[in-house]
Amino acid sequence: ETTPADRSVQIEEGRQIFLKGCSSCHGLNAEGMQIAPALIGVGAASVDFQVGTGRMPMADMSTQAMRKDPIYNAEETAALAAYVASLAPGPAIPSESSLNYERDGSTAEGGELFRNNCAMCHNFAGQGGALTQGKYAPTLMGVEPKHIYEAMVTGPQSMPVFSDKTITPEEKLSI
């Protein structure tokens, strides 16, 4: 379990990574700039998803950024996420234990929820597809369950946020 002292060290490590690798676009205080959005209040889940998948958003939401290979390892990504989470509340990274999606009956339920909420953009097979105005929904093949869950709670790029009232946490796990 992480102690408050460990958490403080991780936040400071994240701040140092942020200042070196992120502040030129997001601002010294994560306030955002013309080229990149503010990060205050986006939460650790958003950072973990964006940095961990290489799907950084643009400040101008009418433009879709191309996916790039992630440049930070898991420890650095966790430190960045901890730093951004320390700035203001936002969606948290789901715990490994909460991502135990191997429940009885969850596969059928997840399939139905996927068809009703996700397939219109990501297509029936999860292969992704074209959207309007030159945007696209990425393939979900090979994406970690954690990142799919984080995308549902943070709404990256053109994707809507699926609040817990729209799709419950248990239903998100089924998807």
Language model segments and positions:
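Extracytoplasmic electron-transfer domains, predominantly the class I c-type cytochrome c fold
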Residues: A38-A88, A125, L131-I175
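Residue-level marker of regulatory loop/turn positions in helix-turn-helix DNA-binding domains and
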Residues: G14, Y72, E102, S106
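Periplasmic/extracellular electron-transfer cofactor-ligation site
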Residues: R7-G41, F49, T53-A59, S86-P94, ...
